[in-house]
């Protein structure tokens, strides 16, 4: 999966408008057309939109990433991990509010909840 394809899949995963993520990272029309064609060839597109198969693939990537990252947290242990989360979690909403005010509500998609219904 190319970076542009990943952006399109993530847009759909989060319920973002069309091609917002890849465009925000500099993708041009030609790159977007190619990425849509490549996703379509994999069976991930129906009527110009990422379909359920594409969303399932994106979820598989999310699950695999979580699995790979889990080792580091297990190494720290439950107590240290909990302490870390308790330390940093209160700043998340403050950080996102600042991003929203300065860059808009789509920036920092990795920190956003899905808007899909």
What residue spans do the PLM features occupy?
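Short amphipathic alpha-helical interface segments
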Residues: 1-34
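Inter-helical turn/loop segments and adjacent helix faces that build the functional surface
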Residues: 18-23, 43-46, 68-76
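Basic amphipathic alpha-helical segments that dock to polyanions
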Residues: 31-45, 54
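Ser/Thr-centered flexible coil motifs
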Residues: 2-3, 51, 77
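Terminal interaction helix/tail motif
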Residues: 71-113
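Accessory beta->alpha helical hairpin/"wing" motif in late/C-terminal subdomains of nucleic-acid enzymes
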Residues: 47-66
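Secretory/endomembrane lumenal or extracellular ectodomains immediately following the signal peptide
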Residues: 1, 7-9, 82, 86, ...
